[in-house]
A protein has these predicted regions:
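Extreme N-terminal starter segment of soluble prokaryotic enzymes
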Residues: 1-5
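CN hydrolase (nitrilase-like) catalytic-core segments centered on the catalytic cysteine
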Residues: 60, 64-80, 146-240
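Active-site catalytic loop in hydrolytic enzyme cores
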Residues: 60, 86-163, 167-168, 175-190, ...
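A cross-domain feature marking catalytic cores of carbohydrate-active enzymes
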Residues: 41, 83, 141, 168, ...
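Hydrophobic residues at beta-strand termini and immediately following loops
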Residues: 6, 55, 108, 130, ...
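Short polar catalytic/cofactor-binding loops
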Residues: 7-13
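Cys-nucleophile CN-hydrolase/nitrilase-fold catalytic domain and related Cys-dependent amidase chemistry
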Residues: 15, 20, 24-100, 107, ...
Length: 249
């Protein structure tokens, strides 16, 4: 199965621009015959950006959701992407797995949001897997991978997932000197080995300009860990990239 990771630039508070970029990346992935394209966390409004209070929409029916569904359908490709969801008085940091006909196969709400981000997002309360032509796929979002005991990824493994897709927003402070990525290798490797599954995390690039991490930069460096816990591929640091990885399923 050919997986594309769309390490795209996200401009906080600019959902129209960001969704147009996402549509372009989906089309580019499909043109290279990828089976699934994975995009970043909160790609519409940007992670923790307060514009979501005005701009986020429902799932299904909101503009971000429906444009991603239309792109998947137009390109006949599976799409996994993170967007902000409005449900009643609550906002959720959400992710969708969308089938090539535009159908929503899986809808995940981030369970393990950082403390300061909970002023904006309500945490989710459930996990699921979706059955696809390549087997079961699970979805988590970024810091979901950090739950004590790596419980979320391990639970998805117990539920039969052979691939876990994780929209992310990996950010570093202005004085960060690198290297970056060991915390993700440490989080992805053990459950990947234990359950013989693949975990893919796709981060955006671009600034964080709201909340406690104002001034930080999202740096990409997206990562795919294989069933032996080794690295199947990693994208560049700090730049946009469309990375293609053959995933064993």
């Amino acid at each position: 199965m050919l997986l594309a990771l769309s390490q795209m630039h996200v401009e906080p508070g600019q959902p129209q621009l960001n969704l147009s970029r996402a549509e372009q990346r989906i089309a580019a992935a499909a043109a290279t015959l990828a089976d699934i394209v994975l995009l970043p966390e909160a790609l519409d409004c940007g992670w923790t950006h307060p514009s979501a209070r005005e701009l986020a929409g429902p799932i299904p029916g909101g503009e971000a959701c429906e444009r991603l569904r239309a792109a998947a359908r137009a390109c006949s490709i599976h799409v996994c992407a993170g967007i902000v969801e409005r449900s009643g008085d609550h906002l959720y940091n959400a992710a969708l797995l969308i089938g090539p006909g535009g159908e929503i196969l899986l809808h995940h709400r981030k369970l393990h949001e950082l403390d300061f981000a909970r002023a904006l997002y309500t945490c989710g309360d459930r996990l699921a897997v979706a059955r696809t032509p390549w087997g079961c796929i699970g979805v988590m979002i970024c810091a979901d991978a950090f739950v004590e005991g790596l419980g979320i990824s391990r639970t998805l493994g117990h539920m039969g997932a052979k691939l876990i897709l994780s929209p992310c927003a990996w950010a570093v402070p202005p004085d960060f000197a690198g290297p970056y990525g060991q915390l993700w290798r440490d989080s992805y490797g053990p459950p990947a080995r234990e359950f013989r599954l693949t975990i893919a995390g796709c981060s955006n690039t671009g600034p964080v300009n709201a909340g406690e991490w104002t001034g930080w930069q999202c740096i990409g460096h997206s990562l795919v860990t294989g069933p032996d816990g080794g690295i199947l591929g990693q994208a560049a640091y700090g730049v946009e990239q469309l990375l293609f990885i053959e995933v064993p399923m």
